[in-house]
A protein has these predicted regions:
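Membrane-proximal extracellular juxtamembrane segment immediately upstream
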Residues: 284, 288, 293-386
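Non-transmembrane, juxtamembrane loop and terminal tail segments
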Residues: 1-16, 106, 377-386
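N-terminal leader/pro-regions and domain N-caps
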Residues: 2-91, 331-332, 340-343
Length: 386
């Protein structure tokens, strides 16, 4: 009995060695317990976890507006059909139905877009994304075809992933927080920091600087002029016009081989800043390809509480066509929990695993009762004597 005690409770203490001494315990209970407690234990663990996950999911507040869909019989007011880079605007309005606590996440959702296709997610040059300008290796060059050159001009970055970037623009134009202050949608901190640190960098040789007179010179002379002194003395700039960050703050910049290369800010003018290029966080988020044809990607977040009944208005600049891949696009505003956003399948998946463990445990328990099998019965051993 002491051996059973050690197996059940650990150790070899006398306090438990002589308590369970009946023949029923020795012959039936202990082998039965050791065989079937695992099923019961896992059923309890998964069922309890499922209830907890489901309760957390119920606390998620989510609002979703589909604003363009190939299958709409009556086109949405924000639909642009096959009009690529339409650059038109429309408004999407949300009425907040429950109090929302920060962080409040802003996602866009695409359907029927297969970023998980091998030919799509391999169509990229990771060395190029890290800043290499010259000497594209044959493997990367082959993977980027047919989007490696465009009319004799090299695309940087090349490939399907970079050149199908989602370029609709969302701007929060109306809404107040619980204290009555205007809401601000933040667009920094949405990409993985490891991607920003180790996977994306401006081209080798890139540089930027404030225009003369602390950035107040915002005409073409900022780009065409050559400094006679200072850090950039004698250096030329590749920009045609300076990039205006805000009023009275303009920057000049230089991209290597600009005459023979089309960079990301030139492919997506007005969407990607030339000062950021491939380090733009919206682009970095896009380049982390999704595993399913229907996916969401983080666009921004709000770090202020919002009360029930508040009205949120987003201005959308429409550029991205979904009719070519027979999909749709949506804007989503939601809170989250430790498991992420709303997921109706996560909690039930734990229920079903717990239910399976219950069925399996019941089946083997009945089998043991009907046709018991003694543990380590030598008659079940088959071996050949030499």
């Amino acid at each position: 009995m002491g051996n059973y005690c050690a197996l059940l409770f650990g150790g070899n203490s006398c306090s438990c060695r002589y308590v369970l001494t009946s023949s029923i315990v020795d012959v039936f209970l202990l082998p039965f317990f050791r065989r079937h407690c695992a099923h019961t234990l896992w059923r309890a663990v998964f069922s309890a976890t499922g209830f907890k996950v489901q309760s957390l999911q119920r606390n998620v507040v989510e609002m979703k507006e589909k604003y363009d869909d190939y299958y709409d019989e009556i086109p949405h007011r924000c639909s642009i059909g096959n009009n690529f880079n339409a650059n038109t605007t429309c408004e999407i309005v949300f009425e907040v139905e429950e109090d929302m606590s920060p962080p409040i996440l802003i996602h866009y959702e695409l359907t029927n877009f297969h970023q998980n296709h091998r030919g799509y997610y391999q169509s990229r040059d990771d060395y190029q994304l890290l800043g290499r300008v010259h000497n594209q290796d044959p493997v990367s060059k082959n993977r980027c075809e047919p989007l490696n050159y465009l009319g004799g001009i090299q695309l940087n970055p090349c490939g399907f992933a970079a050149n199908t970037f989602f370029n609709d623009v969302f701007k929060l134009v109306e809404g107040r927080d619980a204290d009555g202050f205007n809401l601000t949608m933040l667009e920094k901190g949405i990409a993985w920091q490891s991607d920003l640190d180790y996977a994306f960098a401006q081209p080798d040789g890139f540089r930027s600087a404030l225009c003369p007179q602390n950035g107040t010179v915002c005409d073409k002379s900022c780009c065409t002029g050559v400094d006679t002194e200072g850090e950039y003395a004698g250096l030329e700039w590749s920009c045609d016009e300076p990039y205006k960050v805000k009023e009275d703050e303009c920057y000049r910049y230089f991209y290597p081989n600009d005459n023979t290369t089309q960079y990301l800010h030139e492919t997506y003018k007005g969407i990607i800043s030339p000062l950021e290029g491939v380090t733009n966080e919206h682009f970095v988020v896009w380049m982390r390809t999704a595993t399913q044809p229907t996916f969401r990607k983080l666009y921004g977040w709000i770090d202020q509480p919002i009360r029930k009944g508040e009205r949120l208005v987003f201005e959308v600049t429409l550029n991205y066509v979904v009719s070519r891949f027979r999909g749709s696009k949506s804007l989503i505003v939601s809170t989250n929990n430790i498991f992420g956003g709303e997921n109706p399948y996560l909690g039930p998946s734990f229920y079903w695993i717990g239910f399976y463990c219950l069925l399996a445990g019941t089946f083997f328990a009945v089998k043991q009762l009907v046709r018991p099998r003694k543990l380590a019965d030598p008659k079940h051993l088959h071996f050949k004597l030499d």
